[in-house]
Structure formats: C-alpha cells, structure tokens
From Swiss-Prot:
Its EC number is 2.7.1.21, 2.7.1.74, 2.7.1.-. InterPro entries: DCK/DGK, Deoxyribonucleoside_kinase, DNK_dom, P-loop_NTPase. Phosphorylates thymidine, deoxycytidine, and deoxyuridine in the mitochondrial matrix. In non-replicating cells, where cytosolic dNTP synthesis is down-regulated, mtDNA synthesis depends solely on TK2 and DGUOK. Its main location: mitochondrion. Residues 21-45 are annotated as: Disordered. GO terms for cellular component: mitochondrion. Residues 21-31 have a biased composition (Low complexity). The keyword Manganese does not apply. This is Thymidine kinase 2, mitochondrial. One of its GO terms (molecular function) is ATP binding. It is an enzyme of class 2 (transferase).
Length: 265
C-alpha cells in the first residue's frame, strides 16, 4: 500500500533536480550537484529571522506537555508528530503493526515516518518560530538505528533507509536551529506510559525505553553516535508536572530567543 505514493513522491523529488527543470542545478564542469530549489536556504531563513526548534526525547518524556506550554506564545507554530497518519494509512496501522512485530514491519513504518517527517520539515513556515515534536533526524538516528542494532531490521533495509535519509540531507532543507532534549529516566517514562494507556504502547517493554534512552544519550550528550544537527539544550524531565512547567518557563528565553541559542551539544 505504501509503494505507490512513495514512487510518486520519489519521482517528483528527482524531477526537481533533473538538468533543465525548474530549480535544477546548473550543468557543466564545476557545477554544484545540490540545489535546494523551492526550499529556503539557511541564509534565507536567517534573513527572515525564522527558526526551527525540535523537542526530542524518549517515549513519554514530556514532549507533548512542552509543546502545549509554548503553543500560546506569540508568533509560534507547533507541529506535533503525525502519529494519526502512522496509525491509519488507508485503513492500515503500521505503528501498531511495528510494535507487534518489529522485524516484519519496521521498514514499512520507518519509510512512512521518514516521508511524513520530511513533509513536516518542508511545509511552509508562517510564524517566526516553529516548534516541532521530534524530527527527521531522530527518526533516523534513534528509531531506525535501534531497529538495526537490536537485530530487528536487516542490513539491506537499514542501508536503503540510510541512503534515502542521506539524499534528503543533501538535497532538501531539513536544518534546525535548536534541539531541546527532555532527558528522562527510562523507568520514569515506563511509569508514565502505563498511566496514559495508549493502545499501541501497551506492548512496549522497559528494555525498549532503555535502548531508546541510550541512543539519545549517545547522540545528544556524548556526541558519539551521529552528527548533532543543532545546539542542544538539555532539560532534566523526571519531575512532576508543576516542576516541569517551571523549568519550561525558566528556559523560555533560551528556547525562543535566537541570540540565546549558542549552547553547544
């Protein structure tokens, strides 16, 4: 069911970079192969004073609470993860299928996740600040990586997804300006997950959350997994709701004000 829309999307993307097509790179010696076409460049974004902030963290780390806290701020747009799409692709639920049998459905889900997150990154930005729940970067560096490391994704699937991801990085603007990492103990996430009782999450074991936490630490804290796409602001997120809201308020300027983002990973 996913192949037809993906073929159409791929054909459209590739046509954008054919010589002679609108937005295609110039041909000839010394010409650059990569051109971002309709998507704004980093310099254009800086000129327009628009920024993209991604809230990253484990399952049940408090990302939704963070997004809701800042959603009423002036001139900010919030993009949540397109979970409803992952639960219903023309009547199919690839998210639920993946949690039931990751070896069989991991590639199916992550291919669609990569597509839908690309759509999130490249849709027109109307506000000065865009706050996103996760990113195409964590989809690849955390969740695809976990499937592969755990032996639930064959190497050929991993390589194909990685090739798609690398092509996207080279040819499209999925850059971000700040990562807010809600650093949460896996046990805390597990208890929250059980309390909120989402259908697909009922089968998630603590070991899975521990693996996801470990990859976040490698990527965003140690910097030993993959390149970090932006400066990282770490917020310890094991606290109760009232304390988390206080921490969000304390970090408001560091999150929303561009000149306060020179944080480093």
């Amino acid at each position: 069911m996913l192949l037809r829309p993906l073929r159409g999307w791929a054909a459209l993307a590739l046509r954008c970079f054919e010589p002679g097509s609108p937005g295609s790179p110039a041909s000839g010696p010394g010409s650059r192969r990569v051109q971002r076409g309709a998507w704004p460049s980093d310099k254009e974004r800086e000129k327009e004073k628009k920024s993209v902030i991604c809230v990253e963290g484990n399952i049940a780390s408090g990302k939704t609470t963070c997004l809701e806290f800042f959603s009423n701020a002036t001139d900010i747009e919030v993009l949540t993860e397109p979970v409803s799409k992952w639960r219903n692709v023309r009547g199919h639920n690839p998210l639920g299928l993946m949690y039931q049998d990751a070896s069989r459905w991991g590639l199916t889900l992550q291919t669609y996740v990569q597509l839908t997150m690309l759509d999130r990154h490249t849709c027109p930005q109307v506000s000065s600040v865009r706050l996103m729940e996760r990113s195409i970067h964590s989809a690849r560096y955390i969740f695809v990586e976990n499937l592969y490391r755990s032996g639930k994704m064959p190497e050929v699937d991993y390589v194909v997804l990685s090739e798609w991801f690398d092509w996207i990085l080279r040819n499209m603007d999925v850059s971000i300006d700040l990562i807010v990492y809600l650093r949460t103990n896996p046990e805390t996430c597990y208890q929250r997950l059980k309390r909120r009782c989402r259908e697909e999450e009922k089968v998630i074991p603590l070991e899975y959350l521990e693996a996801i936490h470990h990859l976040h630490e490698e990527w965003l804290i140690k910097g030993s997994l993959f390149p970090v796409a932006a400066p990282v602001l770490v917020i310890e997120a094991d606290h109760h709701m009232e304390r988390m809201l206080q921490l969000f308020e304390q970090n408001r300027d560091r999150i929303l004000t561009p000149e306060n983002r020179k944080l480093g990973p």
